[in-house]
């Protein structure tokens, strides 16, 4: 009996490592080995095993390169290099890079060929029933969001060969049907209760010539429409759901296939909307689902992508405007379809998940395509923060968050991050007192003055000035030196809204030690006399600091008496900032 260690890097991910779970089952039930699973380095006290005969390290995201390499290096501290096996998605996509960095040649692709791991029968690992019990090894410190679900494949491969997608490398051969009955039976037999939901990880299930057989098996397994699950703890009934998690291909969704899908407990139906050029096909697919009462829909909206080919088409690089059009289309489409439904009918909802493209060989998340820039990509992230990356079909939310039209949307993308967050409509909170709501409303009104001031300056830029301004901000790096890239007064004022507090302090220090009369006069006049609120971030910073030794007080010469008075009024009597101000006799 060998001691086997399974390692997953300590990045956050939604789904458990299916490959390691299958390897665990192979070692436990075929080779009768002892297996332990750890997410990140082994935590003290969780296992009494001190020596290992083999260590497996999985890799998932290419942009988690650093953590994956660190995990492999950690494995080297436990066993000799010839006892380490590296595999998974990232190392399959970048085998040469992983070998160069670690000295270990990864095992690539699926474990469906003999000899990949050096054991008799290792060609069966991909089809083996996953061992869910290994998740108990990490239960004290990590839980995957979707643990109460079966993770299965009813097909393998895709066949569409989209340029941005890894499936053609990971699963090059299309397999149209894999029965999951026996796997679910074995999982249930090893558990105290069945699992509630079913996540099918198929990359293109609609391509299968056995699609009807797949649907019939799902119904037989208890996942027909309106299927019920009895919670083993509460004994209360809950609805079961099927999620074809990797999405359904709009090009392959026919009325007949939608009719079959409507017979199972699918929620949501995920339909990819990878490019605006797929608009007609996508809209047709949504309408087809709606006709068959598949009412909870979602879509992956790829953005920041370069030109690519796939599905028999060639696609141009997408633009920021394309993203808005696709998101707005979903809002309008849901409104239109729901307006045609009777009051008693269930309405449809369409949730969009914008997904930023990262090249398959990228070791970091920071890729910027030709039609995008760093500022716009960050702005999209900021807009999506309140909804954790999801865009629903609420028209009021969408038009508030993304703008009433493309022009307003493009202006929002140019906004400083904190001003993007200050936008929105005021809503009274019933659970709060009148005084608390009054204070919230006063703050809201004040925030809108800041937003309005920025918009006023921005809208006063001519086309030439706007181009100059955007050339400065689109790199999304805001230092004091930016204002010296222009002599335009409006642009100089606008740039003050972008500077971090640390850079504002450096700017005032620079004014104190250099001759830059034009810029100094514009900044001082604007901050001290025209719009002191532009310095509110600096004010809040100064009120919170514990030590004044990290910066000079040159700013007091340039911020205006109103700013100094606010500091005096709001600072605690014993605060460092107040002591310093008094020492300066201000």
Please place each PLM-identified region on the residue numbering.
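Structural recognition of alpha->loop->beta junctions
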Residues: 97-117, 258-268, 325-408
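Residues that mark the start of a beta-strand
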Residues: 1-3, 32-34, 148, 161, ...
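Surface-exposed amphipathic alpha-helices with a cationic face
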Residues: 28, 71-80, 166, 219, ...
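Conserved C-terminal portion of the radical SAM core fold
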Residues: 54-56, 83-85, 198, 265-270, ...
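Glycine-rich beta-alpha loop elements in corrinoid/cobalamin-binding modules
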Residues: 8-12, 16-148
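Radical SAM enzyme core and accessory elements
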Residues: 3-6, 28-37, 47-49, 81, ...
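Canonical Radical SAM [4Fe-4S] cluster-binding loop centered on the CxxxCxxC motif
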Residues: 18-19, 144-182
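Conserved SAM/AdoMet-binding glycine-rich loop
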Residues: 6, 183-305
